Amino acid sequence: TSRGYWIRETVEEIPGLKSGPFVRLGDGRLLTVEGNACCVSGDEGKTWDEHPIFADPDCFEIRVERTLVRTRSGAIVLFFANDKERANWEWQEDLADSPRAMLPTYAVRSLDEGRTWQDLQKLHDDWTGANRDLIETRDGCIVASSMMMRHNPGRHAVATYTSRTNGFNWIRSNVIDLGGVGHHSGVTEATVEQLGDGRLWMLMRTNWGVFWEAHSADEGLCWQGFRPTTIDASSAPGLLQRLQSGRLFLIWNRAQPEGRDDYPLSGGDGVSSEVAHSNHRGELSVMLSEDDGATWTQPVVIARVTEDSEGKCLSYPRVFEARPGEIWVTTTYAGFGGYLSVRLFERDFV
């Protein structure tokens, strides 16, 4: 690519595309968020018009790990952590904690295709490692995947928020705290999708070599059945998405580079984590399922870091199905995510 990444021969670069996430408006235009602006494009992402989101922008700085959804009724909901209120990250090794760390999460919505935004609300003050997913269920509930840091010792936990009112108000789920010791420990950065039987399925990043899963039978209000999956994974987030074909699409960083089983481990010292783990972020792989995750196609690497890459990570992917079977993949444009913007086609992976 123009940024120095290797991409599979059936994958095409989309030069200059914003990082996303993207939603499609009722008239076919694209909408995303960048900085504190809502950006709208009528030419499939080549040029953009910007609208401010906040009446008082000095109080807000939207973190790059933002999430967006446009509901079937036309509401656009944005979930984000506010960097302007980020405070007190002071990891103390003797405590294995940062007791006063704060990075609040907010929701805000637009009812006029992004021109104006309303109903801004803070959902928690706790340190939010990342907000990673935002979906609408078949019953019209909006479910957002977030995080809340726990203390004594410091570790991360996952929570979701559910809105039955198109983003006007929210109910928090049980907090999923599976333990851990360290500033990158615990369960984190979950992705969520609805299964054919109506339940929600969550895949959580862990330091334990695989994604862990949970299920909810009540639109994300209560999560249960926490257990490891058989999907090997680095300590990095995946993204699960239901395609218009009905297949599930998963993109993630595998625990080991393709063809290797000797990737060096990190952590295990109780500072970053209590267990040594893979931080492999040099490749993004995809696979698809026709039976709600019971079986999957063989994983395929779609992009890889090279010596010439502008960034040495490819992680924190975003997925947008621009047209049926045409999937745009972007990474979170930052050092930890990399700078990938490509399109791939479902037909090439089934």
Residue spans for each PLM region:
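Asp-box/BNR beta-propeller blade signature and adjacent active/binding-site loops
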Residues: 1-350
